[in-house]
Amino acid sequence: MKMSDNKQALQVAALKNGTVIDHIPSDKLFTVVALLGLQDSDSNITIGNNFESKKLGKKGIIKVADRFFTDEEISRLSVVAPNVKLNIIRDYEVVEKKQVLMPEELRGIVKCANPKCITNNEPMTTLFHVIDKEHGILKCHYCEKEQSKEGIKLL
């Protein structure tokens, strides 16, 4: 491509097969990497941050070769980056687009903020009910403590 073509070069290389996670808020990019355990992955991974975005101002993007995420993994994303979009790529073509949506329940993802909650004192899996998706309000199934997504700690 010549510079005189008046076209912009791709900032991130094309992906043959895998998943593109797009529209990640820039300040949440590395949280998403950690949530999905990508730091331990053997796949080729491209991570870009602070790309211009009309919706977010600045955004992050992650391209993971030959990896397709489970619904459980996608649910984890909804806690920190609820408006992320996933593009499923096969043979360089987008074959499916998924909007990350917060599920009705979050199991084993969030730590309860109540120090007296049984999940903080016994070896058991946490369970939260999402009572307000728009504002990210979660309620512990066991002690019924409510917490907002801004104050949560991930497991």
From Swiss-Prot:
Transmembrane segments: none annotated. Keywords: Metal-binding, Pyrimidine biosynthesis, Zinc. Its cofactor is Zn(2+). Belongs to the PyrI family. HAMAP family: Asp_carb_tr_reg. GO terms for biological process: 'de novo' pyrimidine nucleobase biosynthetic process; pyrimidine nucleotide biosynthetic process. Binds 1 zinc ion per subunit. GO terms for cellular component: aspartate carbamoyltransferase complex. This is Aspartate carbamoyltransferase regulatory chain. NCBIfam families: ATCase_reg. It comes from the Bacteria. PANTHER family: ASPARTATE CARBAMOYLTRANSFERASE REGULATORY CHAIN. The lineage of its organism: Bacteria, Pseudomonadati, Bacteroidota, Bacteroidia, Bacteroidales. Disulfide bonds: none annotated. Signal peptide: none annotated. Involved in allosteric regulation of aspartate carbamoyltransferase. The gene is pyrI. InterPro entries: Asp_carbamoyltransf_reg_N, Asp_carbamoylTrfase_reg, Asp_carbamoyltrfase_reg_C, Asp_carbatrfase_reg_C_sf, Asp_carbatrfase_reg_N_sf.
